[in-house]
Amino acid sequence: MLACLTRGNLLDVLQEGFNEQQLQAYVAWVNAQLKKRPSVKPVQDLRQDLRDGVILAYLIEIVGQLALDSDASVDERTDFFLLHSPFKAAGEKLTGVQLSPSNQQEMKSNVERVLQFVASKKIRMHQTSAKDIVEGNLKSIMRLVLALAAHFKPGSSRTVSQGRDSKAPVQSHQPHCATAVAQGAAAALADVCHDVSRSGRDVFRYRQRNASVDGEIENPYWSVRALVQQYEGQQKSPSESSCSSLTSPSPIHSAKSESIITQAEEKADFVIIPSEGIENRTDEPDSPSSRDWRPGSRGTYLEATWEEQLLEQQEHLEKEMEEAKKMISGLQALLLNGSLPEDEQERPVALCEPGVNPEEQLIIIRSRLDQSVEENQDLKKELLKCKQEARNLQGIKDALQQRLTQQDTSVLQLKQELLRANMDKDELHNQNVDLQRKLEERNRLLGEYKKELGQKDRLFQQQQAKLEEALRKLSDASYQQVDLERELEQKDVLLAHCMKGETDEVTNYNSHSSQRNGFVLPVAGRGATTVTHRGPQTSDLQLVRDALRSLRNSFSGHDPQHHTIDSLEQGISSLMERLHVVETQKKQERKVGGRSPRNQASSEYRASWPPNSTLPHSQSSPAVSSTCTKVLYFTDRSLTPFMVNIPKRLGEVTLKDFKAAIDREGNHRYHFKALDPEFGTVKEEVFHDDDAIPGWEGKIVAWVEEDHREN
């Protein structure tokens, strides 16, 4: 029954590629074991009946007891290995199992008890959780049943024991001579070599299948179903070979069958990983790993995992075969020489032993020769390995020497860079010293300039004190001028009364004369009186102007005091203009018919100004704004411009009028701002006195420069 479960069905269970017939075989085997307990109900469905864990507990108790019963009937000499197997303590009843579980938690507790028992007995089985069995996962349930059947083997133990019992008498009469032992060892060695070559052929066939799989992947109509079919086909070939070795009846393979079963179970453990990967990918199609199954990807997760597992399995088999060869060689040496190869000492080897059959001696000599050849091959392999290691060490040495040379070159480059950096550092230090010296020199010059500036400040304060004194004197003069103007107004009033009386007398006289002869005499002496009266005021103004001119000449050409003097002169002129305006308003208020003596005197006073006198300076005079032209001029002695008013309209002002307004001594050049149709805004120079001065936006802008050329 166990062979029915294991032959051809191990990988089917692991891959979940089982059919209904296989399920019925599992159900029949479980029911066959449960018949030993009539009180237990047979199983109908593995998914439903084994979920609670009760049937599993009964099954463990039954198959364990059967295994103990079968072990008792096995011959002690022939079945020594079976008597020392891991299920020796089986057959005991599981404690803590609920025979009638009422809820999900009790079912899970029963299954956990079963899994704990399986783990405690070290029964080979892939990782399975209690949750999977309680939920009715058929794959997990069949794994557990298969593990119990493979471990306890209640049906196959009798067959093996019977076969051994029948063959025991025959084998007991066989002579255990050295020749037979040597032949057995040689046969075992041949079997090992055959197993190694067979595993190599399996790898070769697997690589051929991989090549065909790559061709299918390149096919545009490749699908996941084709890949799964290819994967199932790859795993059937090693399972069939392993199962054939399991069912081999040869007595030579009896000791080797357990190791092959173990290898088959290890293969099952290896295969279980991709099968669970298939289940997870089918349950979760949206997971990231499911995208690796798409036909567009070149290397799939399944192919890579299976290839790695097969290569690891091949390496593991090769290691085991090498160890088996070493053990068999040591056994052969022990049988032939009486000691292991590592325990041998230098002693003469006798080719012929007395009292031994020559054929047996020939067999022994051939066995020794084979052993020597094997040892020679091993020594050659070790020699090649040592040579390869020596080559690797030599390559490492050359690489280290090359690296050391590169590091020496790098160190030299770093030293050169360090030397250049030190040279740059010294150069920067020298530059820093030069800059510090220049900074000290600049600081010394700055101190000298500060001293000179202090001296200039003191001189400026002295000049400012002098200017304040002059302004004080000027204010005193202005006060005196106001007093004089007040006296002048009083005298004008008296003069007006006198003139009025005189006019009345002249009128009376003329009326009398007209009555005489009809001739009117002209009025004389009025203009002379006004001129005589205005003479002292004109002389005072000329005196102030001369004093300011002499004060201006006492300063240098670019001294800022020129601006103060010009402002003073402009203030005096503005004051005179205001006096003139006041007199004009008074004359208009009197409204005397005809030209009054005061108007005549005022006109004569204006006409009495010298030709080079400064016209009144005003910036805001509403009386003369309509008939006057503003003139803004710059000089080379002051940065501040000056402004004067010329009592003429724009376009009628000549250079002579401008010269009379600014009142500058010496030779000068006159430039005026003008608009040229071709060049735009320009400076136009005027030479002749009768030439008209160009204007700019309703005013005149001029630059007055001293002419140092010789006449």
UniProtKB/Swiss-Prot annotation:
Residues 278-295 have a biased composition (Basic and acidic residues). Residues 20-153 form the Calponin-homology (CH) domain. CDD domains: CH_DIXDC1. Residues 597-623 have a biased composition (Polar residues). The modification Phosphoserine is found at S212, S257, S618. InterPro entries: CH_dom, CH_dom_sf, DIX, DIX_dom_sf, Dsh/Dvl-rel, Ubiquitin-like_domsf. Residues 279-452 form a coiled coil. GO terms for cellular component: cytosol; focal adhesion; glutamatergic synapse; postsynapse; stress fiber. It comes from the Eukaryota. Residues 237-254 have a biased composition (Low complexity). Pfam families: CH, DIX. Residues 600-680 form the DIX domain. GO terms for biological process: canonical Wnt signaling pathway; cell proliferation in forebrain; cerebral cortex cell migration; cerebral cortex radially oriented cell migration; forebrain ventricular zone progenitor cell division; modification of postsynaptic actin cytoskeleton; negative regulation of neuron differentiation; positive regulation of Wnt signaling pathway. Phosphorylated on tyrosine and serine residues. Polyubiquitinated, leading to its proteasomal degradation. WNT3A signaling increases DIXDC1 protein levels by inhibiting its ubiquitination and subsequent degradation. One of its GO terms (molecular function) is gamma-tubulin binding. Residues 233-258, 271-298, 584-623 are annotated as: Disordered. Residues 153-326 are annotated as: Actin-binding. Keywords: Actin-binding, Cell junction, Coiled coil, Cytoplasm, Cytoskeleton, Developmental protein, Phosphoprotein, Ubl conjugation, Wnt signaling pathway. Abundantly expressed in brain and testis and to a lower extent in lung, kidney, colon, ovary and urinary bladder. Expressed in brain, liver, testis and spleen (at protein level). Expressed throughout the brain with strong expression in main and accessory olfactory bulbs, cerebral cortex, piriform cortex, hippocampus, habenular nucleus, dorsal thalamus, superior and inferior colliculi and cerebellum. It is found in: Cell junction, Focal adhesion; Cytoplasm, Cytoskeleton, Stress fiber; Cytoplasm. Belongs to the DIXDC1 family. Positive effector of the Wnt signaling pathway; activates WNT3A signaling via DVL2. Regulates JNK activation by AXIN1 and DVL2. May bind filamentous actin. Directly interacts (via DIX domain) with DVL2 (via DIX domain). Interacts with gamma-tubulin. Interacts with the complex composed of DVL2 and Rac. Interacts with AXIN1; competes with MAP3K1. Interacts with MAP3K4 preventing MAP3K4 interaction with AXIN1. The coiled-coil domain mediates interaction with MAP3K4 and inhibition of AXIN1-mediated JNK activation through MAP3K4. The DIX domain mediates interaction with AXIN1 and inhibition of AXIN1-mediated JNK activation through MAP3K1. Mediates interaction with DVL2; this interaction is required for activation of Wnt signaling. This is Dixin. It comes from Mus musculus (Mouse). The lineage of its organism: Eukaryota, Metazoa, Chordata, Craniata, Vertebrata. The gene is Dixdc1.
